[in-house]
Amino acid sequence: MVLIRVLANLLLLQLSYAQKSSELVVGGDECNINEHRSLVFLYNSSFGCGGTLINQQWVLSAAHCDMENVQIYLGLHNLRLRNQDEQIRVAEEKFFCLSNKSYTKWDKDIMLIRLNSSVTYNTHIAPLSLPSSPPRVGSVCRIMGWGAITSPNETFPNVPHCANINILRYSVCRAAYRGLPAQSRTLCAGILQGGIGSCMGDSGGPLICNGEIQGIVSWGDDICAQPHKPVHYTKVFDYSDWIQSIIAGNTTATCPL
């Protein structure tokens, strides 16, 4: 299951916000209002995804979150209450590993978005650093978003929820999901006993370890947070050179094989 959701409701409020948003965490608690300054919401009135601000003009998300006419919301907390620090941008240009936007569940599910204008940092908006090294197995990392907090009967909050999960050995994911290759440019992460995990609509959001974005929510089981059913996250460290090359202006840079 790719962790994306068709939103049933159009955005409400003055500039229209969704009553049911598209990024969340089963088993988490409401995030501190200053904890998710890099978290962004991608929305086009039908679909929603998460993303991560990595500098004033660039957002990182998942390739399967690509959508037309997307608006990018920064500085959000409660989707039904406006705050003065919010900013909205659109995508000026999108970059993918392959020109045909091809990706698999274990490779190249990554999208880099150049915003139409630079973001102004403030109390509720700040970038997240790219990884300096990959996370170790056993590392405790943070997930966050506004999506489903129960599964399979989905309920959605108005505020983002956060939770801690662990980096697991890739062999755990291979045992949980048949057909995976021997190696992958993904991270396997979750709680083995279940009860906590990324869920429907969390796609594109961050996996944060030691203050760095180490993963991008990619896919998991149809029923979220089940025992021995962790989630796959695109391994950002493997794409760091590609990301930095694109940002530096080398728009023909290629992803790792």
Curated annotation (Swiss-Prot):
The active site is at residues 64, 109, 203. Negative results: does not cleave the gamma chain of fibrinogen, does not show fibrinolytic activity, and does not induce or inhibit platelet aggregation. InterPro entries: Peptidase_S1_PA, Peptidase_S1_PA_chymotrypsin, Peptidase_S1A, Trypsin_dom, TRYPSIN_HIS, TRYPSIN_SER. Residues 19-24 form a propeptide. Residues 25-248 form the Peptidase S1 domain. SUPFAM superfamilies: Trypsin-like serine proteases. It comes from Macrovipera lebetinus (Levantine viper). PROSITE patterns: TRYPSIN_DOM, TRYPSIN_HIS, TRYPSIN_SER. This is Chymotrypsin-like protease VLCTLP. Keywords: Disulfide bond, Fibrinogenolytic toxin, Glycoprotein, Hemostasis impairing toxin, Hydrolase, Protease, Secreted, Serine protease, Signal, Toxin. It is found in: Secreted.
